[in-house]
Amino acid sequence: RAQPTIASYYKDWGYSTAYVHPFMSSFYSRERVYANFGFDQLIFDEDFTVPIEYYGTYIEDKTVFNQVEKLIKETDEPLFLHTTTMQNHQPYDQGENPEDEMGNYFQWIEHTGTDFEAFINNLKEIDEPTVVFMIGDHYPSLKGENSVYDQLGMNGDNCGVLYEQPFIVWSNYDLDYSGMPQEKFSTFYAPYVLMDLIDAPRDSFIQAMMDKMETTPVYSTNYDASVGRDEDLDILTYDRILGDIVSS
C-alpha cells in the first residue's frame, strides 16, 4: 500500500522524486515495494540512460553518479533523489587476486573515492542549490577463518560496531552546519538530520522524530542492551508500517 515516506514529503513540497539503483528491479521486490514510496521515477539497471560500466562484480559508482547528474540537469523542478549503490558490495574474492579480499575492497573504495570527488566537482558547476548526503549501511563482509574480523576478535556478540557508519554531507552553497549532530544516532534519523539542515517544513510527525532524536539518539539493543523499549518509536513504526497511518 502507499505509505508516507521521506520521498512523499519532498513530493508534497513540490519536488520531483527519483530512486536510482544499479541492480535488478526484482531483487527484494524493490520495483513493487518502492512504487508505494512516493517516487516519480524508479531507475534500475535496465533503465539507465547513460553508458554502463562495471567495476568488480557490479555496475561502478561512476555510472551511478553520471545517471544522477543527468537527472539533475534534465529536471526542471527541485529534485529529491535517493540512490543505493552496488559497486563495493560483496563478494570480494574477484579479479586477479581472489584470495586478497581486503586488498580488493580497498582498491574498490579507492576507485569510488576518485569518482565521488569528480562527481562533487561537477556538482560545484551546477547552478542549483544542491546537497549530497552519503552514508553506508555496514562495513564489508569478509570471509575466511583468518579474516580481519577474526584477527580483531569479533564475533556475534560484538559485531554491532560493523554497523556504526560515518556519513558525509556536502553542499554547493552556504549552509549552517553548526546544528549537525556530533554524537552517534540511529540511521533512521538521517532523513530528519537532512531536513533540519535545509530548514524543510515540519509537520507533527517530523517534529516528533526530531524531538525523539534529542532524547533517544540511538535506538538499538545491538548497540546497547540496556536500552529499553521506546513506546513512542514502536507505536510510530507500527502505525507507519502496519497500522492506519494516523500519525501523518
Question: Which role fits each region the language model picked out?
Answer:
Residues R1-S248:
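Solvent-exposed soluble domains appended to multi-pass membrane proteins
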